[in-house]
């Protein structure tokens, strides 16, 4: 929004041209989202406490979690507000990639909000029934996938980048819609499953978003993209601002979500953030790289799939409890140890993912 204003004012004072620089807007994006989160965080927490919107804890999980009962939830509203405000202020709103990302974040945020509302306000332990949650996630993913596919104007927008291989860019055709669908729905649910311990989901989200910001910048720069043998997508560079807004909002939320948490993000935050990572990876054509960088999310989701599959097929469980972070808690690991070790794994995987841009 302010980009347009700066363009107009530049004719009167050339100094306003500084706001056309992507790096400056990225920095302002992260600072705006961070400061907004830090300022509004205490106010939101008090409001949630006043309305008695607190987390309900299952009694069949780790006993240490019982003390978390009643902790304010739906803090994801703070994250989404900061992301939207920062992006709308500093991004170029004529860019379709920006709007596609905001649509995914907002629509999945609505799905998560309905789920949280039913759980914590209407006291329905099931929340939004799983089949309906999956239905709306699918509708959102398919709408976005089809819209992007049928409005694509260059071959690079629908090619698949294969990590470790130089100039291997197979055209996906209609399979692009399938890939996009699984990237959005899969990542959204994976982040949702990871959000079970204080700060466990938000830090990997911040790390992956920061890495995607770097990739978006490289992809949107013709010189860097040619040097690294990745598709050149001029619209992708504006996603840097969205990614830095996610990083800033995430850091601000972490201030209140770190152990012991003062607030949880709830499904309104986790579903939206997962969808954000998924759609950005799709737009910069790095869906496969997201599997590496988001390895913690993949590990959490796979642990649930394996646990359920094993129990249905063999009548036996593989883990003491799934998602896998609860397995380690039941083995006797203190919660902070589980959290920090998963953070370390995420740092290593994100760095490994970035390294693949050069190792080809």
UniProtKB/Swiss-Prot annotation:
What Pfam families would the database entry show? Glycos_transf_4 (PF00953), MraY_sig1 (PF10555)
Q: Which InterPro entries match?
A: Glycosyl_transferase_4 (IPR000715), PNAcMuramoyl-5peptid_Trfase (IPR003524), PNAcMuramoyl-5peptid_Trfase_CS (IPR018480)
Q: Where are the transmembrane segments?
A: 18-38, 73-93, 97-117, 135-155, 168-188, 199-219, 236-256, 263-283, 288-308, 339-359
In which pathway is this protein known to take part?
Cell wall biogenesis; peptidoglycan biosynthesis
* Keywords, ordered alphabetically: Cell cycle, Cell division, Cell inner membrane, Cell membrane, Cell shape, Cell wall biogenesis/degradation, Magnesium, Membrane, Metal-binding, Peptidoglycan synthesis, Transferase, Transmembrane, Transmembrane helix
**What cofactor does this chain's UniProt record say it requires?**
Mg(2+)
For this protein, the record's PROSITE patterns field holds: MRAY_1, MRAY_2
Q: Give the enzyme's EC designation.
A: 2.7.8.13
Sections of the chain in a coiled coil:
none
Q: Record's Gene Ontology CC terms?
A: plasma membrane
| Reactions catalysed according to its record | UDP-N-acetyl-alpha-D-muramoyl-L-alanyl-gamma-D-glutamyl-meso-2,6-diaminopimeloyl-D-alanyl-D-alanine + di-trans,octa-cis-undecaprenyl phosphate = di-trans,octa-cis-undecaprenyl diphospho-N-acetyl-alpha-D-muramoyl-L-alanyl-D-glutamyl-meso-2,6-diaminopimeloyl-D-alanyl-D-alanine + UMP
Query: What is an example of a GO molecular function annotated in this UniProt entry?
Result: metal ion binding
The entry's localization annotation reads: Cell inner membrane
Q: In what way does this protein cross or attach to the membrane?
A: Multi-pass membrane protein
Gene Ontology annotations of biological process type: cell division; cell wall organization; peptidoglycan biosynthetic process; regulation of cell shape
Q: Per the similarity annotation, which family is this?
A: Belongs to the glycosyltransferase 4 family. MraY subfamily.
- PANTHER family to which the protein is assigned, alphabetical: PHOSPHO-N-ACETYLMURAMOYL-PENTAPEPTIDE-TRANSFERASE, PHOSPHO-N-ACETYLMURAMOYL-PENTAPEPTIDE-TRANSFERASE HOMOLOG
Briefly state the protein's biological role. Catalyzes the initial step of the lipid cycle reactions in the biosynthesis of the cell wall peptidoglycan: transfers peptidoglycan precursor phospho-MurNAc-pentapeptide from UDP-MurNAc-pentapeptide onto the lipid carrier undecaprenyl phosphate, yielding undecaprenyl-pyrophosphoryl-MurNAc-pentapeptide, known as lipid I.
Protein name, UniProt field:
Phospho-N-acetylmuramoyl-pentapeptide-transferase
The record's gene field reads mraY
